[in-house]
């Protein structure tokens, strides 16, 4: 069980012409509407790079939920190119790789996320899970410990670390 972060980012500074698609892209109640809004916002190509990155990230998450990994990977790559300092893009791409059992690729993406945000407890936790699936319990325990150091209330990290320490 890995932990997922869903982005509902705010696209700031959108012009009035883009307000409709931006609003649709940011709402999360109707995924079809969100997908159409993000696509329209991206197709206009007029937003600030970090806003376009958020639109790609939101759309990628929808594609991932719908099982369209190919499209999700493309949007995660676009988000990372547009806003290379946003840790959510590699984190969510890592989740996609994890779900596809591509644990080495997941670890690389989670590692990038923690390079960008050293306080990203969920990235440490999920990287620990990927290490554990690959049989590297030492690295997994280290990541679970780091996740707990950042978020002492993380029951998932605590449970995993206790289980590893009892073996």
Locate the predicted segments by residue.
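N-terminal leader/linker segments that initiate helical-solenoid repeat arrays
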Residues: 12, 16-47, 53
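Conserved structural position within tetratricopeptide repeats
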Residues: 40-47, 77-81, 112-115, 148-149
